[in-house]
From Swiss-Prot:
<keyword id="KW-1131">Modulation of host NK-cell activity by virus</keyword>
<feature type="glycosylation site" description="N-linked (GlcNAc...) asparagine; by host">
    <location>
        <position position="68"/>
    </location>
</feature>
<dbReference type="GO" id="GO:0039671">
    <property type="term" value="P:symbiont-mediated perturbation of host natural killer cell mediated immune response"/>
</dbReference>
<comment type="similarity">
    <text>Belongs to the HHV-5 UL16 protein family.</text>
</comment>
<keyword id="KW-0945">Host-virus interaction</keyword>
<dbReference type="GO" id="GO:0016020">
    <property type="term" value="C:membrane"/>
</dbReference>
<protein>
    <recommendedName>
        <fullName>Protein UL16</fullName>
    </recommendedName>
</protein>
<feature type="glycosylation site" description="N-linked (GlcNAc...) asparagine; by host">
    <location>
        <position position="84"/>
    </location>
</feature>
<feature type="glycosylation site" description="N-linked (GlcNAc...) asparagine; by host">
    <location>
        <position position="145"/>
    </location>
</feature>
<feature type="topological domain" description="Cytoplasmic">
    <location>
        <begin position="206"/>
        <end position="230"/>
    </location>
</feature>
<keyword id="KW-1043">Host membrane</keyword>
<comment type="subunit">
    <text>Interacts with host ULBP1, ULBP2 and MICB.</text>
</comment>
<keyword id="KW-0812">Transmembrane</keyword>
<keyword id="KW-0325">Glycoprotein</keyword>
<keyword id="KW-0472">Membrane</keyword>
<feature type="glycosylation site" description="N-linked (GlcNAc...) asparagine; by host">
    <location>
        <position position="101"/>
    </location>
</feature>
<dbReference type="Pfam" id="PF17622">
    <property type="entry name" value="UL16"/>
</dbReference>
Length: 230
């Protein structure tokens, strides 16, 4: 089905408005069947860097590993939007059952991506197309006895809009500044584009073909001249 350009899904608009209307930046992770309720604080999440991976574009795949998951424990993925950190979406499981799904499910490829194995290891797969609505921070979390723990973190960004936090997975050498790194990347791209352009320009002038033909003609004559001199 073809979507109109420039349109925004109504579900996403309502989701943003509802979150903007709330004064607190905390989200309840508990369910009616759970004995305790965990709260997810966005400000606290921003200061946690347990382990990070960066993805630029295409498809982002987040794999969360959990050990010794109990039936009462809640596991899932918390998504924080790149353009507004007060916008938080959750994908939660409890006892192999979805108790909360992402609001923007059109870009959630593996909606039922929970893969259970024998204890003690549990895997949770999240796969989404990288768009303007899905860029941001993905935190693998688990809620147990009223405590929220962040297991793994994935940053998804378009271009260089999302700032690199200190100690990120793509940390550069301390002796290299940001300006030097940007200049080196720009110079490398310019050299690469120039080399490709020159190659196709010479190819259009048939210079490589002519050079190969001249070598094929001259090499036998030189070999015959050497044999005559011997």
């Amino acid at each position: 089905m073809e979507r109109r350009r420039g349109t925004v899904p109504l579900g996403w608009v309502f989701f943003v408005l509802c979150l903007s209307a709330s004064s607190s930046c905390a989200v309840d992770l508990g369910s009616k069947s759970s004995n305790s309720t965990c709260r997810l604080n966005v400000t606290e999440l921003a200061s946690i860097h347990p382990g990070e991976t960066w993805t630029l574009h295409g498809m982002c795949i987040s794999i969360c590993y959990y050990e010794n998951v109990t039936e009462d424990e809640i596991i899932g993925v918390a998504f924080t939007w790149q353009h507004n950190e007060s916008v938080v979406d959750l994908w939660l499981y409890q006892n192999d059952t979805v108790i909360r799904n992402f609001s923007d499910i059109t870009t959630n490829i593996l909606q039922d991506g929970l893969k259970m194995r024998t204890v003690p290891v549990t895997k949770l797969y999240t796969s989404r197309m990288v768009t303007n609505l899905t860029v941001g921070r993905y935190d693998c979390l688990r809620c147990e006895n009223g405590t929220t723990k962040i297991i793994e973190r994935l940053y998804v960004r378009l271009g260089s809009l999302y700032p690199r936090p200190p100690g990120s997975g793509l940390a550069k050498h301390p002796s290299v500044s940001a300006d030097e790194e940007l200049s080196a990347t720009l110079a490398r791209d310019i050299v690469l584009v120039s080399a490709i352009t020159l190659f196709f320009f010479l190819l259009a002038l048939r210079i490589p073909q002519r050079l190969c033909q001249r070598l094929r003609i001259r090499l036998p004559h030189r070999y015959q001249r050497l044999r005559t001199e011997d």
